[in-house]
Amino acid sequence: MSLHIKERYGLLINNEWVPASDGAEFNVYNPANGEQLAVCAEATQADVDKAVAAATEAFKTWKTVSQVDRADYLLKIADAIDAHKEHLAQVETYDNGKPIRETLNVDIPLGADHFRYFAGVLRAEEGSAQVFDENTLSLIIREPIGVVGQVVPWNFPFLMAAWKLAPALAAGCTVVIKPSSHTSLSLLELGSILQDILPPGVVNIVTGKGSKSGQYILDHPGFSKLAFTGSTEVGLDVYKAASERLIPATLELGGKSANIFFEDANWKQALDGAMLGILFNQGQVCCAGSRIFVQDTIYDKFVAELSKLFDKVKVGLPWDESTQLGSLIYEAQVKKVLSYVELAKEEGARVVAGGERITDGELGKGCFVRPTLIVDATNDMRVAREEIFGPMAVVIKFHSEDEVIEQANDSLYGLGGGVFTQNLSRAIRVARAIETGRMWVNTYNSIPAGAPFGGYKQSGIGRETHKVILEHYTQMKNIIINLSDKPSGFYDLD
């Protein structure tokens, strides 16, 4: 599989590709082999200023575009993504290290579907009216909030960009968006698609390190809203920056989700759900089912079979269609995951699968870690409480329904979770009792457009992938109309 991309990428400002104002650039590498992929512009404060100015000017006309026409724009974007699906999937795979089977079948088509979903939602959007009395009519309408600053992460660069761009454009907002400096290429390639579809300045893409270009976005007074996906630590900085200017922020942050398996679960479905919960996207998923709770009556058998399945997972070069687990994002993430393996041992848990880096052959050049299963863990261990963000799960034994609910909720986070059981009443009870924004029943990591996604507690604020997010990108306006031709009667007008 050969990749065809530019050697050098600029910033997309006002529908033009431009270099950074000071000429600064940074390199982008393939995490699977360490090879350089491209060079990207490092946006300066002046560049962000220009991008915001372009978005501000474009907003004057974009906000007046009809719902019908905005929906048509979104559909054109979706069709263009489909037309370039194979190319975009390759770019995402080389840039991020995730298997091509995931980018081709999940990331890219799901991104396109989000544009289609919001096009449909937009056509169905209505205001409301209320008659207070025979002479007073109240109209409620929603208007776009303005210029939005968006920052997307490295784990799902293309998909997270689609999650944020689609509702913002549907609402009538204009955007300045920044990808992670580790994974800038798929959004830049999307920029070339948007450049041919959208009016100038509606979407502007600035690239660079979060500590510089990202901070310029957080601090810029020209934004009416911020949207961020990433760690809870950085999310707090985003929230603080927004609060200091009294603007709203949508935050999708960290997680340490519980994946719960009762003794009556469908056996193969349960094993598959445990693997899907922690190995999809190399476990670099904010809602990964990294805490696996298994009922004591099936614990030993479940652990024995799951560990064998972990060992059978094909770790390979991400562009190989048979690869099931690809590369982690960069060297520091490898070291972080392996440090938790050692910590688990120190805390008294056992490693029954994986727990090591692949150092030989082609994979030795990249950031590959074998699927890792930690057993005999307890919920108070650091490995069960801290977000690791890799293909590593801890398995915790439980006895009763009440016990597992209490332990699952004993977490700073509340983003995702799963429950596997053939008892429908139990499934609903547990799903309702877990303090989390998304619960899966007898499945995991399904993220369709139209299903609201977001977190409780320190996992974020707001919901994405659902029409409710349009409320985050709009403001409510109320218009009171007097239908009478008579004065108020409060004053003597004669």
PLM regions with names:
Residues 1-32, 356:
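Hydrophobic face of amphipathic alpha-helices that form TPR/SEL1-like repeat modules
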Residues 33-39, 260, 314, 364-494:
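Conserved C-terminal structural/oligomerization subdomain of aldehyde/semialdehyde dehydrogenase
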Residues 35-125, 135:
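Glycine-rich loop-to-alpha-helix module at the N-terminal edge of alpha/beta enzyme cores
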Residues 59, 63, 78-85, 89, ...:
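Structural signal for hydrophobic packing residues in well-ordered secondary-structure cores
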Residues 127-269, 398:
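Rossmann-like NAD(P) dinucleotide-binding subdomain of oxidoreductase/dehydrogenase enzymes
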